[in-house]
Design a protein with these regions (language model features):
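Long, charge-dense
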Residues: 190-198
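His/Asp/Glu-rich metal-coordinating catalytic cores
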Residues: 3-7, 12-188
Length: 198
């Protein structure tokens, strides 16, 4: 998917000389340039020295693969299956199957309990690379959302305001939808344009 923790090295790969293909889903391919520009601008504004130039950033190309794709061009003997991971628009899990070497399932970031984006069932793989960012958390998403709603309602009742710094796609849109659905109609909700557009 297009989040910086998965795509920010693409301009650096170009700076190192990589000119091969980069494949992604069509939504991810469309979102990557904007995410990269925003991330690079943010990094520079905070004094970071990036290991690539403007031209490397401008020349990043991502080739979209339609959701039913099974054969990746230029990789004979490899079958790729992917399905929606529910994390954000364009995010997928991927299963790679080699004729002679077995199969590998890579989950990427997953959100099995999302309200807006569905996740497809995971297939079996002989080897597994599993995203575990929240592995230490035992609180189910529904319980997290209920707690957030309680805190937001309590704050609003006390004439306070709630600010949620969330990513513009994926969880941010999911939280906005949840709060709009659950909070009383007279409670104003303000959101960054990108969250609303998601």
């Amino acid at each position: 998917h297009a989040h910086e923790d998965h795509t920010a090295a693409l301009p650096y790969l170009r700076a190192l000389g990589y000119r091969g293909p980069v494949y992604a889903t069509a939504p991810t391919a469309a979102l990557v340039p904007g995410f990269l520009r925003k991330w690079a601008s943010y990094s520079r504004n905070h004094g970071d020295r990036l290991p690539f130039g403007e031209q490397d950033l401008a020349e990043v190309r991502v080739t979209p693969l339609p959701l039913g794709t099974r054969q990746v061009p230029g990789l004979p003997g490899l079958t790729v299956t992917f399905g929606r991971s529910g994390h954000m628009l364009g995010s997928v899990w991927m299963r790679f199957a080699w004729e002679r070497a077995g199969s590998l399932l890579y989950t990427g970031d997953m959100a099995l309990e999302g309200r807006l984006l569905a996740a497809d069932p995971l297939p079996k793989g002989e080897f597994l690379i599993l995203e575990c960012a929240y592995a230490g958390s035992r609180l189910a998403q529904d319980a997290q959302y209920r707690r957030l709603l309680e805190l937001a309602a309590e704050t609003v009742a006390g004439k306070g305001r709630v600010l949620l710094p969330v990513p513009p796609r994926g969880r941010g849109a999911d939280l906005l939808f949840f709060l709009a659905e659950k909070l009383p109609q007279d409670v104003p909700l303000w959101a960054e344009g990108e969250v609303v557009d998601a």
